Swiss-Prot record:
Encoding gene, per UniProt annotation: LCA5L
InterPro entries referenced in this protein's UniProt entry, alphabetically: Lebercilin-like, Lebercilin_dom
Protein name per Swiss-Prot or TrEMBL: Lebercilin-like protein
Species per Swiss-Prot/TrEMBL record: Macaca fascicularis (Crab-eating macaque)
Family that this chain belongs to: Belongs to the LCA5 family.
Region (Disordered): 17-44, 351-402, 495-520, 533-581, 605-668
């Protein structure tokens, strides 16, 4: 059995014995109260003994608080509670025993007397009480020993805690001391940081003072060294003089004093002369250096001026070269069209006027815009002529012109100043500038003359128009309306051509025109006055206009050409709705006039005079170009198509006195 079971059995036995004792005591008290008092006294004595023992056992712990009474009270309360719980069980057991004792008595011990039973029960009761008391003493002793053990452990823990507290206090003191030291060090460091600028200033002042002392000491050393050198030199000089004097004193073959003084005077005079020469030479050196510096400055200025002049000349040469290149390009462009013009002229002279096919007419239609562009470029490129009221009617043989110009330009460029002599350069430049100014003046005078002549012609034309009758003016207005209609038709034609495309083949261009129905051309008959007005000529004829008979011939020729072109178009089946074509033979003299005007613009009037003198025999055929020029009025300009199919004559606008009388006519 285990210890727990043993303890349970012992406790049960104790409680059962206690219950029996209580029952018996109650019975004995009823029977004999004396014995009850004795038992009470004995129990009280036992209790007192127990308390005395507990006090004796705890006497050694008088210094500390005694917890035995409280512990016993707690144990007694627990025991009483247990007794109250187990009283009914004990009563039932006692009843069973009593019944068993009765049965045994009834069977075998009927002879035993009541006194023996009482003594026997008393001895048993005493023995049980003694056992219970011993057991109580053992339990109390164990509990008290455990309590003492616990108290000792707590005392030991208290002592350990006291030791730990003392150690912690000592550590805290040490840490406080360290903190104070650290605070002092931090305060010193902060103070040192605050005092840093003061310390630095003190240090700098000390360094400055030390440097000043060093300088003073060095200066003193230098002065002392100079004094030493001076003294050394004086000593050497004195030694030399002493040696010389000793030698003189030792010499016995010396001359007389007069001779020596004479020699001294001669030597001194020579020395003075030498000094003067040296001074004069120094002055001459200074003067020569100044003169040389001046000459150098002058030469440098001259070189700078020459360099600037060379730079300007180089820039001018570059500009001239660029202009020459541009003019070469222009001449190349012009030469292309001049060759084409010549080819077209040869073609017109070779084979007769035959009605052109529809494909050729389509080609003429397909490229009107390129011809007009080329005409614009030719008009912009050709310079204005200085001759009286004459304009260029075509561009011919420009290759020969360009070659001659290219031959003459290097000749003029070679005349430019070279970089060898500055004086010649400046003189040449001044001459060239004068020459250019003269050329500009000549050109201005020629232009002014041309302007005056144009103004006079305009005034004459205005006067003649004012003298016209009102009937002729009424005839002009419907013609102006017809010209406006022609312009509108031409603009529509241009738009249609732009839509169809300029790069299409001639067959494609001819297709839309062949489909449409052919339109008969209308024939108009105008008076001479209206025809003259169409061509920009004065309308009035007769004696007042006797000088303008040339223009009447040109109008008749123009009308005949127009009728021939109408017949050609009627044969070919193609009738353009506007314009008229005219072919003009250009002679070689026009080229000469153009060349002379171009050379005059490029190189001045003097060069043109030289060329005129060199070629006097060319003036024979000058009448033919005049006739060709008279065929065109001064307000017209002719140009050929790029492919020579047709020729365009553009009539410039004439501005009369009233703005409504202005007129513009474009003929293809």
């Amino acid at each position: 059995m285990s210890l727990a079971d043993l303890t349970k059995t012992n406790v049960d036995e104790q409680f059962s014995s206690v219950a029996l004792e209580n029952n018996r005591r109650s019975a004995e008290c009823k029977r004999s109260p004396g014995t009850g008092d004795f038992s009470r006294n004995s129990s009280a004595s036992a209790k007192s003994v127990d308390y005395s023992r507990s006090q004796c056992s705890c006497g050694s712990l008088s210094s500390q608080y005694d917890y035995s009474e409280d512990f016993l009270c707690d144990c007694s309360e627990k025991a009483i509670n247990r007794n109250y719980l187990k009283q009914p069980v004990v009563k039932e057991k006692e009843k069973k025993k009593y019944n068993v004792s009765k049965i045994s008595q009834s069977k075998g011990q009927k002879e035993i007397s009541v006194e023996k039973k009482h003594t026997w029960n008393a001895s048993l009761f005493n023995s049980q009480i003694h056992m219970i008391a011993q057991r109580r003493d053992a339990m109390a002793h164990r509990i008290l020993s455990a309590r003492l053990h616990k108290i000792k452990g707590l005392k030991n823990e208290l002592a350990d805690m006291h030791h730990k507290l003392e150690a912690i206090l000592t550590e805290n003191q040490f840490l406080k001391q360290l903190q104070l030291r650290h605070l002092k060090a931090i305060g010193k460091y902060e103070n040192s940081q605050n005092n840093l600028p003061q310390i630095m200033a003190k240090h700098q002042n000390e360094v400055k003072n030390l440097r000043q002392l060093l300088r003073k000491s060095q200066e003193k050393e230098r002065t002392v060294s100079r004094k030493l050198r001076e003294t050394d030199s004086q000593l050497l000089k004195t030694k030399d003089t002493l040696q010389a004097l000793q030698k003189l004193s030792e010499d016995k073959n010396l001359a007389e004093r007069e001779e020596l003084t004479h020699k001294l005077s001669i030597i001194t005079t020579k020395m003075e002369a030498n000094d003067k020469k040296i001074q004069s030479l120094e002055k001459q050196l200074r003067l020569n250096s100044r003169v040389f510096s001046r000459q150098l400055a002058i030469e440098t200025r001259k070189t700078l001026a020459a360099q600037t002049a060379t730079k300007t000349l180089q820039v001018e040469v570059k500009h001239l070269q660029q202009k020459l290149k541009e003019k070469d390009r222009e001449l190349e462009i012009k030469n292309i069209y001049s060759h084409r013009i010549l080819k077209n002229l040869h073609d017109t002279e070779d084979y007769p006027k035959v009605s052109s096919t529809k494909s050729v007419q389509a080609d003429r239609k397909s490229l009107p815009f390129t011809s007009m562009r080329h005409q614009g470029t030719q008009k912009s490129d050709v310079p204005p002529l200085t001759t009286k009221g004459k304009k260029a009617t075509g561009n011919m043989n420009h290759k020969e012109k360009s070659t001659e110009i290219n031959r003459e330009i290097p000749h003029c460029v070679n005349k430019l100043p070279k970089q060898e002599d500055s004086k010649t350069k400046y003189e040449d430049l001044s001459r060239e500038e004068k020459h250019l100014e003269v050329q500009v003046l000549l050109e201005n005078t020629g232009r002014q003359k041309d302007k005056k002549e144009d103004q006079e012609k305009k005034t004459i034309f205005v006067k003649e128009e004012q003298e016209l009758p009102p009937k002729i003016i009424e005839v002009i207005h419907p013609e102006r309306e017809s010209t406006q209609e022609d312009v509108l038709v031409r603009e529509k034609f241009k738009r249609s051509m732009q839509r169809n495309g300029m790069d299409d083949t001639p067959d494609k261009c001819t297709a839309p025109y062949t489909k449409g129905p052919l339109r008969q051309r209308r024939h108009y008959s105008f008076t001479e006055a209206t025809e003259n007005l169409h061509h920009g000529l004065p309308a009035s004829g007769g004696p007042a206009n006797a000088g303008n008979t040339k223009y009447s011939h040109s109008t008749s020729k123009h009308l005949s050409n127009r009728e021939e072109m109408e017949l050609e178009h009627s044969d070919s089946g193609y009738e353009p709705s506007f314009g008229k074509s005219s072919r003009i033979k250009v002679k070689d003299t026009t080229f000469r006039d153009k060349k002379s005007s171009l050379m005059e613009e490029l190189f001045g009037s003097g060069y043109v005079l030289k060329t005129d003198q060199s070629s006097p025999g060319v003036a024979k055929g000058s009448e033919e170009p005049l006739q060709s020029k008279e065929s065109h009025p001064p307000s017209q300009a002719s140009a050929s198509n790029a492919f020579g199919d047709s020729k365009v004559t553009v009539v410039n606008s004439i501005k009369p006195s009233s703005p409504t009388e202005g007129k513009r006519k474009i003929i293809i």
